From Swiss-Prot:
It comes from the Eukaryota. Residues 196-209 have a biased composition (Basic and acidic residues). Changing T315A: In strain: ps4. Changing S267T: In strain: m32, msh37, ps14 and ps15. GO terms for molecular function: protein homodimerization activity; RNA binding. Residues 196-226, 384-477 are annotated as: Disordered. Keywords: Developmental protein, RNA-binding. GO terms for biological process: bicoid mRNA localization. Changing G220S: In strain: msh9. It comes from Drosophila pseudoobscura pseudoobscura. PANTHER family: MATERNAL PROTEIN EXUPERANTIA. This is Maternal protein exuperantia-2. InterPro entries: Exu, Exu_RNase_H-like, SAM_Exu.
Length: 477
């Protein structure tokens, strides 16, 4: 597959970056499949925990046992964690507290490819599959391709899947004119559900002009939405597909009164409309692979700046976020630690300033901070700038509280650290210890408490034997 990619689709820039030329998806008859994943984190080195796909003809869902554990944010987002029982690791749900059945990554990917090939086999008139995803960062296709690349399955994947289509920019284009800026999956689903419920209410009022009561069963729909956990990739895949269909149907109609849900319209017509709408926002698989390759090179350039921002990563979250932003901005423009050092050796600080002003993602004060940081790192006569962190008062209060508790035990202060409060109001030090029974005391018996009295001696003599006379009835025997 990689060898089949044309060299004209990428051109090398002066900075060493790989500029990907976007190729448009050719017109044809394709199957739309919404795909979602749950991962151990939000980095390319993380692993897939759950892989899910949804289409009008069926769905696919499989949990994957990762080699690494989920980070704290991923555990809270997906409500699953990795547990160890003896020598075995397994996934456990944090909602039901039950063990989740999972497979290895290669087995899950093979099942996913078999499912995609089965979809194409059932519809021989289709030319391929276009995968829908809703993500502003393009994280989902990169993670899927990274997993397929581990086991050399990209060629087989390319036989079925022709392109990836991102519904996030499509939603921003359609809803931007209405003043809607937040185009997250959850927000869009709520907006479209409200518009659908409002239109159904208007239709009921139009059908009952006399005011006759009409009962609509909205409780079942609400309970279904409430019971569906959006942290699961299986639920989100279905949400992506239904949201895209509803978005196209609402955009195709001019007035909200004529809104038609995808359930009432024919699925084939709705899918054709959706396919025509997502074509401008789709990207061929070859272009996505080249973008992934450039992302891996960008990560290598980011890691080269680690010595510069080492002090930033050792401080608070604010400085760590700024360090990540600076590294991404430098790496996206093709700079490395060695290339910036060559510029500094040639033109010193003015040369760095000329280069950093070309980064549009940085503000003026951020550019000045980054310039001073790089200049102090490259110049041996200067000390490297270290971020100044304001110490919060929590640690001081905690130490003072500990000191107060220690001094109160010594009886120097009263309750709450106030000398005017008597010590009788303070909490007692503890229960008086009860005297333990001493084995030696039991053996020696009561001791003489008078001063100068000799210690009691142990009684070793046995008591005198007592003669017992037999009863009279046994005397004649």
């Amino acid at each position: 597959m990689v060898s089949a990619i044309s060299e004209d689709s990428a051109s090398a820039t002066a900075s060493g970056q790989c500029e990907v030329v976007k190729e448009e998806l050719p017109a044809g008859n394709y199957i739309l499949v919404a795909v979602e994943i749950d991962t151990t984190g939000r980095r390319l080195i993380d692993e897939i925990v759950q892989l899910a796909g949804y289409t009008s003809k069926g769905n696919f869902q499989q949990y994957i046992m990762p080699y690494m554990n989920l980070n704290q944010a991923a555990r809270q987002r997906h409500q699953i964690r990795v547990i160890s029982i003896g020598f075995y690791r397994m996934l456990k749900s944090m909602q039901t507290y039950k063990i989740i059945k999972s497979k290895s990554e290669v087995a899950a990917l093979m099942d996913f490819l078999n499912w995609l090939e089965t979809l194409l086999a059932k519809q021989p008139n289709k030319e391929g599959i276009v995968m829908l995803y809703h993500d502003d960062r393009k994280f989902i296709p990169y993670m899927i391709l990274e997993a397929l690349k581990k086991y050399s399955l990209i060629d087989r994947f390319n036989r079925s899947v022709k392109a990836f289509a991102n519904t996030c920019p499509m939603a921003k284009t359609f809803l931007g004119k209405h003043g809607i800026k937040n185009c997250g999956l959850r927000k869009l689903s709520m907006l479209l559900a409200k518009s659908k419920d409002g239109n159904s209410t208007k239709e009921d009022e139009h059908e009952n002009p006399e005011g006759n009561s009409s009962i609509t069963d909205n409780s079942g729909h609400k309970n279904q939405k409430q019971g569906a956990f959006e942290g699961s990739a299986n639920v989100r895949a279905k949400m992506v597909y239904e949201m895209a269909l509803q978005l196209i149907e609402s955009e195709s109609t001019e007035s909200p009164e004529s809104f038609e849900s995808p359930e009432s319209s024919e699925s084939s017509e709705a899918e054709v409309k959706l396919l025509n709408a997502v074509r401008p926002f789709s990207q061929l698989l070859s272009s996505t692979i080249l973008e992934l390759k450039d992302q891996n090179h960008s990560l290598g350039r980011q890691n080269s700046f680690r010595p510069v921002f080492l002090n930033y990563f050792r401080t608070t979250l604010n400085y760590r976020v700024r360090a990540v932003k600076y590294r991404i901005g430098l790496a996206e423009h093709g700079f490395t630690l060695k290339s910036l050092k060559a510029i500094w050796s040639d033109k010193r600080k003015p040369g760095l300033e000329l280069v950093l002003t070309a980064i549009d993602s940085l503000k003026t004060e951020e550019t000045a901070e980054l310039l001073d940081l790089l200049d102090s790192y490259y110049d041996p006569s200067k000390t490297t700038i270290k971020p100044r962190c304001k110490r919060s008062g929590n640690g001081t209060r905690r130490r003072n509280r500990a000191k107060g508790a220690a001094s109160s035990k010594n009886g120097a202060i009263g309750a709450g650290g106030d000398n005017s409060v008597p010590d009788s109001a303070t909490k007692p030090g503890g229960r008086p210890r009860r005297k333990r029974n001493n084995i030696r005391n039991n053996i020696l018996g009561p001791q003489n408490t008078e001063k100068g009295s000799p210690k009691a001696e142990m009684k070793t003599s046995t008591p005198k034997s007592m003669s017992i006379k037999p009863p009279s009835e046994f005397a004649d025997i």
